């Protein structure tokens, strides 16, 4: 019974919704926050069909702390608008966010987008919930056949107390090189407040399976990790381990609605 429970929880954990190759996660063994079009909304501009995605994320292996995400994208002509609702936390601590995104494809190699989110935080002992907001522009371009450059920034008004909110600014620059049909190499730089974090790693792809390895060079606590993804019948399964974050796992489901994307003349 114990092993059966572990197997069930393994299947129902983190969010790794299956994606096209151009929007696949650049995260390497859970050491990167630059991932997919749920984060950097500019990637959603490349979608060809309406997509509905559902996923569950477990931050630590078999822990209470988890996140549920519902995401839907509507591509039309060169413009894609998306909506996301996510709930993070456990019974005594919860963060709820609702996000709307807009992305435009300027050329087949370049897209930009912006998203705005409303944040609501509540914990046991607080009389009322605390709220904030987040604005996040994103951009990506292929400046050579297999060279992808992506930029992403966040401006967050985070609730600290009922009387005080704090503005937090962060920016990410990521470079991805497709070495061949099997191997992708990614490098990322993150700046938040006065902290600088560098990340790098690689992904090895074999049809529906991919292996990720990488390292994070943080000023105080460097870390390394590895993980894998499996895509099958519009499901996506993922698990990864990071030396500073522990083991995380995920399950995602994506439904494509077979409408054709029409382009304005």
Locate predicted features.
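Sec/Tat signal peptide C-region and signal peptidase I cleavage site
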Residues: 14-18
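Subset of outer-membrane beta-barrel
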Residues: 19-265
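Positively charged n-region of N-terminal signal peptides that target proteins for export
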Residues: 1-4, 108
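Sec-dependent N-terminal signal peptides
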Residues: 3-13
